[in-house]
Amino acid sequence: MAISKEDVLEYISNLSVLELSELVKEFEEKFGVSAVPVMVAGGAAAGGAAAAAEEKTEFDIVLTDGGAKKIEVIKIVRALTGLGLKEAKDAVEQTPSTLKEGVAKAEAEEAKKQLEEAGAKVELK
């Protein structure tokens, strides 16, 4: 009895990620091929599209400038981070400073909005 494509696909869909990775390596060795995607002409445009498709899910909130209303910014930094007054003041005055790391996109954007409304400059990395 011959094995159909559907049987092969069903078998592959039931593999764990580790087993699938090992299978790909064996294919590469046996057939002398590579699983690396081929770059096409106009690579810069394709690279931008790939980056957009692979959207980040975790962000670092980096304060780049405390702005003119430092007291208001310090209050927001304290509320966002739970830092004490001195630590928050140092973070606002010694820029750039990373306020939070590995934050969800929605939380990072909300923090950025609050800080920018107070006059600070913020980057999400």
Curated annotation (Swiss-Prot):
Any one annotated GO CC term: cytosolic large ribosomal subunit
CDD domains in UniProt: Ribosomal_L7_L12
Metal-binding found in the keyword field: no
Domain of life: Bacteria
GO molecular function: mRNA binding; structural constituent of ribosome
Keyword Transmembrane helix belongs to the record: no
Keywords of the record: Ribonucleoprotein, Ribosomal protein
Classification via Gene3D superfamilies: 3.30.1390.10, Single helix bin
Family listed: Belongs to the bacterial ribosomal protein bL12 family.
Chain's role: Forms part of the ribosomal stalk which helps the ribosome interact with GTP-bound translation factors. Is thus essential for accurate translation.
Quaternary structure and interacting proteins, as annotated: Homodimer. Part of the ribosomal stalk of the 50S ribosomal subunit. Forms a multimeric L10(L12)X complex, where L10 forms an elongated spine to which 2 to 4 L12 dimers bind in a sequential fashion. Binds GTP-bound translation factors.
Name of the featured protein: Large ribosomal subunit protein bL12
Organism in which the protein naturally occurs: Campylobacter jejuni subsp. doylei (strain ATCC BAA-1458 / RM4099 / 269.97)
